């Protein structure tokens, strides 16, 4: 990619997300989504290869289809209500179409087929943007229309997403696919609590971004994309050996790490609304998510593959570029739970 084009592309993505998040008019919301999508495609194809081209094509076709459904829903809603503002989305069928379009953009089940493949076909840092920044615009739309959403449909999509993300991550050796399936699971938790308490969705999104960013930065330091490469971390970057397992356990939601906080407050919110069966199902299915993280940690940190003495001394010659925000992110990933009462008080 031309270095001169990078500032333009990244500023377009930032502007598109900002327009969508701050706009209350459906047309400008749609324009922001389109800016975001078209500017992100060059990032996916930064390293030209058949795999990246395939990933960009899948991303474009999925997002374009979702945008078409969204535009159809916007036009239908404007014809029925005579309004273009997002707060007037009270008609049933346009609201259902908007939910399906946003579920497709977020990669929720049963529209999740593109997320693992696109993430696997991109570099680590492009995958980080795909699984974090690209979620902001659709979630901001869902947040603004949360009062008019169909609760039963949203809960169905959420449980399906948790099931797809938890079962899909089993038997995976590619780390990017594992993080993609984890993202699908987290989207299910976020959308499940949205009709009851939208602020909890924002809290969940914030913690999810912190955890995912930390995981991708740690993997990028070691250039680890598979389980085998991750198992060689100890002899390249010794100080990463305890940090990667703790980050993965936090992503899996193991207490007392930070990743347990969203699940804790979401289950509490469901309990306040006299709903016990749904959070129980969600929590039980999510145990599969924690299981494949535990298995990944066991195979990479506890077991030791046979290797020569020359490989064992490799850590003496490894030099990595400093990552300024990584210590702060690691601290937030593991130790944010004790200050959770203060965070909940703000919300």
UniProtKB/Swiss-Prot annotation:
One of its GO terms (biological process) is mitochondrial electron transport, NADH to ubiquinone. It catalyses: a ubiquinone + NADH + 5 H(+)(in) = a ubiquinol + NAD(+) + 4 H(+)(out). Keywords: Electron transport, Membrane, Mitochondrion, Mitochondrion inner membrane, NAD, Respiratory chain, Translocase, Transmembrane, Transmembrane helix, Transport, Ubiquinone. It is found in: Mitochondrion inner membrane. The chain crosses the membrane at residues 13-33, 60-80, 96-116, 123-143, 149-169, 178-198, 201-221, 247-267, 274-294, 326-346. It comes from the Eukaryota. It is a multi-pass membrane protein. Its EC number is 7.1.1.2. Coiled coil: none annotated. GO terms for molecular function: NADH dehydrogenase (ubiquinone) activity. One of its GO terms (cellular component) is mitochondrial inner membrane. Belongs to the complex I subunit 2 family. Core subunit of respiratory chain NADH dehydrogenase (Complex I) which is composed of 45 different subunits. Interacts with TMEM242. Core subunit of the mitochondrial membrane respiratory chain NADH dehydrogenase (Complex I) which catalyzes electron transfer from NADH through the respiratory chain, using ubiquinone as an electron acceptor. Essential for the catalytic activity and assembly of complex I. This is NADH-ubiquinone oxidoreductase chain 2. It comes from Pan troglodytes (Chimpanzee). The gene is MT-ND2.
